[in-house]
Amino acid sequence: MGLIVYYSSRSENTHRFVARLGLRAARIPAGGADAFHIREPFVLVVPTYSDGDGKGAVPKQVIRFLNDAENRGHIRGVIAAGNSNFGETYGLAGDVISQKCRVPYLYRFELIGTEEDVANVKHGMERFWTREQL
């Protein structure tokens, strides 16, 4: 199965979700993302940060990571975390990355996700990577 690449802030919400998946994963560092390189296909798991207008939805570290052409060339899909209290901007980072990188927006979960979210993503990743190998 492919790799999960993720970013998590000090809250560790995204990290906790990814850890519960039990899948192979690599974390984008909070500092120095410019030197972080991935050389294989991956699905990106990203939290959403934004103001009320949706600005700043994608964390700066993730933007720097994806600005590297090699990293961007290996992304195959995106999963976003968010907070439904923010209404229309819930999971907005996934929409932005999906559109800019032209990859599918595979799933959205709230905060650290539920057990159902974890099961859905695990099962979805198995199906996704099986199709990617065809």
From Swiss-Prot:
One of this protein's Pfam families, by short name?
Flavodoxin_NdrI
Q: Which InterPro entries match?
A: Flavoprotein-like_sf, RNR_Ib_NrdI_bac, RNR_NrdI
Question: What domain of life is recorded for the organism?
Answer: Bacteria
**Which GO molecular function annotations are given, in alphabetical order?**
FMN binding
Biological process terms in GO annotation: protein modification process
Q: What does this protein do?
A: Probably involved in ribonucleotide reductase function.
Similarity remark: Belongs to the NrdI family.
Q: Which HAMAP family match?
A: NrdI (MF_00128)
Protein name (record): Protein NrdI
Traced from the root, the source organism's taxonomic lineage reads: Bacteria, Pseudomonadati, Pseudomonadota, Alphaproteobacteria, Hyphomicrobiales
In the UniProt record, the gene name given for this protein reads nrdI
